[in-house]
């Protein structure tokens, strides 16, 4: 291993080419959606299956008007601005300045982030790995590798899962339990899962920069470096508040190993203390905002990551790390304490369920140190990457990117039944009618699938908007579904009680049954559904 390797100086042409390819891969889903969209249809920019894209699209527009800290429009309860969304504020402002839609600014920004993350990962691998084959093996494994969860996902989706009881009991039923998922099904736990996801590319980049700044401050100690590390920790926490806990877990794990090995005890203690203070300061600021908002802290918890699922996420890397751990630790200095501490911090947090509410956040960035240490163990002693080793790598890491490519290909294909991805002229007319009539405090009631395409351009509030941001979401969502399934006899009472002004009913929910509701007036009708406006005062005036 190198004692004083370069970081970004002298990056080879191949690394730049790889970064450009990664950036192009980020653009492919949107490019394909644009190509397959029929005349008259608009690509919204949401070619992902995640409902969070609706949330981000709302924030891009809302933050441009309200500022980098926004109020919560996904719930009916009054609240003061408390959600820090600086990234979406920048996206919205760039969109306003350029005239490009926020979604396309978001996608192009993601391409830049993908390129930067690729260069950062390459530079990090080069810093810790001196042998060229080890470097490229680690780099490619991090950027496009995964685990064996792709096989499980494929098996679960296949007819075999329904034809054989043993497959159902071993795979289908366990993964059908609430909040049980392999890493392949999560958005940001692998780099390859994040390549088409601008949001998680940003988080990966900020978290990795913060961890590397922490290491640099220890290695080349100065108070300026300490300050930069603290700022990096604070910045990553502002971008995604969960990362603050992950970063502190890494920092304290590195510090513990350095103390055990009697390596730079003062330096690691000083840097850890500064970074801890920075993260706590951000937590305090966000806590103050939430406390003043008038809304409770959301009760949502992330999915637990079981030890076996974590092993299946990186099986080859875990085997190599455990195989060579004793020697790797015995010969280690600061660099090895840092990488092992990084692994330990992420792993402990990942396996902290049920006590820590968001354990899946610990996986983010784990792939980098785990893969680098695994490569160092394998190539120690001049081992070669022969055809058999390459085949094993592909077998144990290749299912994830294959499944991800297939999912992205499917999700970016045209579907006239998914207006959150492709807006028809009728859909755009419905949105225009809603925006013409709506005020900022008006409440919209719509089914889950319809919120995904109505929400981004809607300036008002939602009765049941988002699983994390809506107060008492489960109850409100269930009430929405019950109302849409009902015979509409209690619709007027429900709409009045919850001060709902706009009510969208898709064709699949039979909007005709709501035409007899007193005060519920069709505002805009298409073949796909009816946008109603509830005007109880008109009913009182007619009575």
Residue ranges of model-derived segments:
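Transmembrane catalytic cores of multi-pass membrane glycosyltransferases
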Residues: 227, 236-337, 344, 353-358, ...
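Extracytoplasmic
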Residues: 52-54, 167, 171, 397-543
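Transmembrane alpha-helical segments
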Residues: 117-125, 204-218, 248-257, 318-325, ...
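Signature aromatic-anchored transmembrane alpha helix within multi-pass, membrane-resident enzymes
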Residues: 270-281, 380-408
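Active-site lumenal/periplasmic loops and adjacent helix-entry segments of GT-C-fold
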Residues: 23-208, 215, 241-245, 420-421, ...
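Hydrophobic/aromatic-rich transmembrane helices and adjacent perimembrane loops
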Residues: 245-247, 357-382, 392-393
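Aromatic-anchored segments of alpha-helical transmembrane domains
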Residues: 23-27, 142-148, 233-238, 276-287, ...
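Short hydrophobic alpha-helices at membrane interfaces in multi-pass membrane enzymes
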Residues: 213-234
């Amino acid at each position: 291993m190198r004692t004083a390797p370069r970081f970004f100086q002298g990056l080879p042409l191949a690394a730049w080419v790889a970064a450009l390819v990664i950036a192009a891969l980020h653009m492919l889903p949107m490019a394909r959606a644009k190509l397959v969209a029929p005349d008259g249809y608009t690509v919204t920019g949401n070619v992902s299956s995640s409902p969070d894209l609706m949330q981000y699209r709302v924030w891009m527009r809302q933050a441009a008007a309200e500022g980098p800290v926004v109020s919560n429009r996904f719930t009916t309860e009054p609240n003061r601005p408390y959600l820090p969304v600086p990234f979406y504020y920048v996206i919205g402002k760039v969109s306003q300045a350029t005239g490009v839609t926020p979604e396309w600014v978001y996608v192009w920004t993601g391409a830049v982030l993908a390129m930067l993350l690729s260069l950062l990962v390459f530079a990090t691998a080069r810093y810790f790995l001196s042998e060229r084959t080890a470097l490229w093996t680690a780099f490619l494994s991090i950027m496009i590798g995964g685990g064996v969860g792709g096989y499980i996902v494929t098996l679960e989706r296949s007819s075999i899962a329904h034809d054989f009881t043993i497959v159902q009991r071993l795979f289908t039923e366990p993964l059908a339990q609430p909040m049980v998922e392999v890493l392949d099904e999560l958005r940001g736990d692998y780099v390859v899962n994040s390549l088409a996801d601008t949001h998680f590319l940003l988080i990966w980049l900020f978290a990795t920069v913060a961890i590397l700044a922490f290491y640099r401050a220890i290695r080349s100690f100065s108070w300026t470096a300490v300050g930069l590390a603290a700022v990096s920790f604070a910045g990553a926490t502002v971008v995604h508040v969960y990362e603050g806990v992950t970063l502190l877990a890494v920092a304290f794990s590195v510090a513990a190993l350095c103390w055990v090995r009697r390596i730079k005890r003062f330096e690691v203690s000083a840097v850890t203390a500064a970074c801890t203070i920075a993260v706590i300061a951000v937590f305090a600021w966000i806590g103050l905002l939430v406390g003043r908002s008038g809304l409770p802290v959301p009760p949502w918890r992330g999915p637990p990551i079981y030890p076996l699922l974590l092993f299946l996420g990186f099986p080859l890397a875990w085997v190599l790390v455990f195989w060579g751990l004793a020697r790797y630790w015995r010969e280690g200095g600061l660099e090895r304490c840092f990488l092992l501490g990084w692994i330990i911090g992420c792993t402990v947090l990942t396996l902290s369920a049920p006590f820590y509410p968001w354990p899946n956040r610990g996986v983010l960035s784990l792939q980098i140190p785990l893969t680098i240490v695994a490569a160092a163990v394998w190539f120690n002693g001049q081992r070669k990457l022969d055809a058999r080793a390459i085949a094993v790598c592909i077998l144990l890491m290749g299912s994830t990117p294959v499944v991800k490519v297939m999912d992205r290909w499917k999700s970016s294909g045209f579907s006239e039944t998914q207006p959150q991805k492709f807006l028809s002229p009728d859909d755009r007319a419905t949105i225009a009618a809603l925006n013409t009539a709506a005020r900022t405090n008006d409440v919209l009631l719509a089914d889950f699938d319809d919120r995904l395409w109505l929400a981004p351009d809607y300036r008002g509030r939602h009765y049941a908007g988002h699983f994390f941001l809506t107060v008492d979401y489960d109850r409100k969502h269930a009430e929405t579904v019950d109302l849409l399934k009902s015979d509409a006899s209690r619709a007027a009472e429900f709409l009045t009680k919850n001060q709902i002004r706009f009510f969208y009913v898709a064709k699949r929910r039979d909007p005709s049954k709501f035409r007899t509701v007193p005060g519920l007036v069709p505002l805009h009708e298409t073949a796909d559904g009816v946008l109603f406006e509830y005007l109880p005062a008109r009913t009182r005036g007619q009575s």
